[in-house]
């Protein structure tokens, strides 16, 4: 395997618009999900995995237009997010009302296990973030 086989160019990302059940919910239906390295936590078995070689971790991504909400959810693994572009609101709690932070390009947020979290692009235009599990 060469380095080129392990390269994912941003312009070549292959999105999935139905990776999770929440993509059928109003407000979440415009989200694009990306499974970059490893199978991730997508609920759609047909989602394209850019690099499927086992790594011991997963990296995914989400691209959302302004006002698009990723519904509250939790994981059995810790998850952290790296903001690639835009400004994002992260909300915690089952209903999203336990806490809220606004983060920008280059910022990183770590979410512990079993914490309900959701996030929303709060700027005009499309924004992108990476998720590491």
Predicted regions and their residues:
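Glycine- and acidic-residue-biased ligand/ion/polar-headgroup-sensing regions
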Residues: 65-66, 76-89, 93-94
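Conserved short histidine dyad/triad with adjacent acidic residue
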Residues: 39-47, 58-75
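A short hydrophobic beta-strand segment most commonly corresponding to one strand
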Residues: 80-82, 107-110, 118, 124-133
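Short histidine-centered beta-strand/loop micro-motifs
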Residues: 47-52, 69-75, 92, 100-102, ...
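A short, N-terminal "cap"/entry segment at the start of jelly-roll beta-barrel domains
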Residues: 1-56
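Short connector loops at helix/strand junctions that flank enzyme active sites
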Residues: 54-57, 75, 83-85, 104
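Histidine-centered metal-chelating micro-motifs
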Residues: 68-71, 89, 108-109, 113-118
């Amino acid at each position: 395997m060469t380095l080129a086989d392990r390269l994912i160019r941003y312009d070549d990302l292959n999105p999935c618009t139905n990776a999770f059940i929440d993509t059928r919910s109003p407000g979440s239906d415009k989200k694009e999900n990306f499974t970059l390295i490893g199978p991730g936590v997508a609920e759609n078995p047909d989602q394209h995995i850019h690099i499927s070689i086992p790594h011991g971790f997963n990296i995914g991504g989400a691209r959302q237009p302004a006002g698009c909400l990723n519904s509250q959810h939790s994981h059995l693994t810790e998850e952290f997010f790296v903001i690639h572009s835009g400004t994002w609101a992260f909300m915690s709690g089952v209903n999203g009302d336990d806490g809220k932070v606004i983060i920008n390009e280059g910022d990183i947020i770590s979410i512990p296990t079993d914490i309900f979290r959701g996030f929303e692009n709060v700027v005009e235009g499309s924004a992108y973030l990476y998720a590491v599990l």
